[in-house]
From Swiss-Prot:
Oligomeric form and interacting partners: The HisPMQJ complex is composed of two ATP-binding proteins (HisP), two transmembrane proteins (HisM and HisQ) and a solute-binding protein (HisJ). The HisPMQ-ArgT complex is composed of two ATP-binding proteins (HisP), two transmembrane proteins (HisM and HisQ) and a solute-binding protein (ArgT).
Keyword Hydrolase: no
Family: Belongs to the binding-protein-dependent transport system permease family. HisMQ subfamily.
GO molecular function, one term: transmembrane transporter activity
Organism field: Escherichia coli (strain K12)
Protein's name in the database: Histidine/lysine/arginine/ornithine transport system permease protein HisM
Ranges of residues in domain ABC transmembrane type-1: 23-221
InterPro entries on file: AA_ABC_Transporter_Permease, AA_ABC_transptr_permease_3TM, MetI-like, MetI-like_sf
Membrane topology: Multi-pass membrane protein
Gene name linked to the record: hisM
Length: 238
């Protein structure tokens, strides 16, 4: 194990000398997909709870498709399937975009987490106490101001525990990136195994690194929950 760590610590953590690899790419995939997917989900969640069926139905269909199919299949569709379409091959931008395994992986991860996060945020919006909404209306808040000042802040606090689980699941999902030849942590572990024939050591090191990242993320979310959810915890009685 010491020999493997000594020889492969750089590609495991951040670079093989030519490109970013390992933990660096895994974190990059996670951050991009969670940030872009989270921002999109915030707007889609508002539409998801809309009473207008022409707004609500397309969003429901989107979340149904991406939550109802495996992420692995979605990645294969984007990476292997899209490039076979004539419209993709005939359009310069689409041709360049879907030829990149990294682009396809980010797209699949982003849309997948966006679908799940949309439902998390929509459920949180529905859980905002009705009294808060009525009070905002009584003060003459516009719909935009009511969402900005009352509904979304409350909904995001409510959604935080479930959303933290989604982020951890997305970290685990980045391990599928090797399918699109992206040199993430698992891809480097597979390469180490192929070079050394020591699968227990190669994948064991990867597992430890995933655990460390998970621990850091869980700790950050626990700090956030203590800060923003302290007021909703029941007070202790003696």
């Amino acid at each position: 194990m010491i020999e493997i760590l000594h020889e492969y610590w750089k590609p495991l953590l951040w670079t093989d000398g030519y490109r970013f690899t390992g933990v660096a790419i895994t974190l990059w995939l996670l951050i991009l997909s969670v940030v872009i997917g989270g921002v999109l989900a915030l707007f889609l969640a508002i539409g998801r709870v809309s009473s207008n069926k022409y707004i609500q139905f397309p969003i429901w269909l989107f979340t149904y498709i991406f939550r109802g199919t495996p992420l692995y299949v979605q990645l294969l569709v984007f990476y292997s399937g899209m490039y076979t379409l004539e419209i993709v091959k005939g359009t310069e931008f689409l041709n360049a975009f879907f030829r990149s395994g990294l682009n396809c992986t980010v797209l699949a991860l982003t849309l997948n987490t966006c679908a799940y996060t949309t439902e998390i945020f929509a459920g949180a919006i529905r859980s905002v106490p009705h009294g808060e909404i009525e009070a905002a209306r009584a003060y003459g808040f516009s719909t935009f101001k009511m969402y900005r000042c009352i509904i979304l802040p409350s909904a995001l606090r409510i959604a935080l525990p479930a959303y933290s689980n989604e982020v951890i699941l997305m970290l685990h999902s980045t391990a599928l990136a090797f399918t699109a030849t992206v040199p993430d942590l698992l891809k480097i572990a597979r390469d180490i195994n192929a070079a050394t024939y020591q699968p227990f050591t190669a994948f064991g090191i990867a597992a430890v690194l995933y655990l460390i990242i998970s621990y850091v993320l869980i700790s950050l979310f626990r700090r956030a929950e203590k800060r923003w959810l302290q007021h909703v915890k029941p007070s202790s009685t003696h």
